Amino acid sequence: MKAIVVAAVGIAGISAIVALAAYGQVDTIASRNGSKWKAVVDDGGNLHVPDAYRTTYQLLGSWAVAADQSQGSKELHVVYASPGTIDAYRKDGRFPDGAVLVKEVFEAATGPMTTGTVSHAETMKGWFVMVKDSKGRYAGNRLWGDGWGWSWFDADNPSKTTSTDYKADCQSCHVPARGSDWIYVGGYPPLRR
């Protein structure tokens, strides 16, 4: 009986050592690859919309895209930043490596209210996700370049981008913001220092 208890304690001890060693290895890999990255980027550099970003990220700001011929807005954009991004940006005016920005794009509905004509988010169209990459980790992936990973996701599939080339599919909208690292920082009050 004593031998069985000693064997059981020995097996438990070895199991704990193996588990700690495995955790250390996983922790080292996560540190090397950046745990922020794993929430949004796979090993091949493919992006996806991060889980629970509405509750774990910080609201950066929102935009209303004016309707072409009528009052109100045709789209509303709501932008979130991964934890720590705002504080890091406010310290030195740069987005930190691994920062994730998620832009929700909604079709807007417009109607009269007691305060006047009002637009509100109606139907999700999709997401635009950007990941700061100051080290050029995915140079062979056409969705990465100019310091960022870039991808658009339709509302029905937050795991698979419809973007194929950031220069053709994404960057043209950001050209006016080239001088501020491709981001329209003036529209985001939390970034003001």
Segment roles from a protein language model:
Residues K36-P50:
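N-terminal module-boundary/linker segments of secreted carbohydrate-active enzymes
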Residues G72-K91, P112-T115:
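N-terminal post-signal-peptidase region of extra-cytosolic proteins
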Residues V18-T28:
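Signal peptide processing junction and immediate N-terminal pro/mature segment
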Residues V26-N33, V41, Y53-S62, A66, ...:
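Sequence context surrounding c-type heme c attachment/ligation sites in exported
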Residues M1-V5:
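Positively charged n-region of N-terminal signal peptides that target proteins for export
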Residues K38, R54, Q58, H77, ...:
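Generic detector of well-ordered alpha-helical segments enriched in charged/polar residues
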Residues L47, V79, Y184:
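Short clusters of hydrophobic/aromatic residues that line enzyme substrate/ligand-binding pockets
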Residues A8-A19:
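Bacterial N-terminal signal peptides
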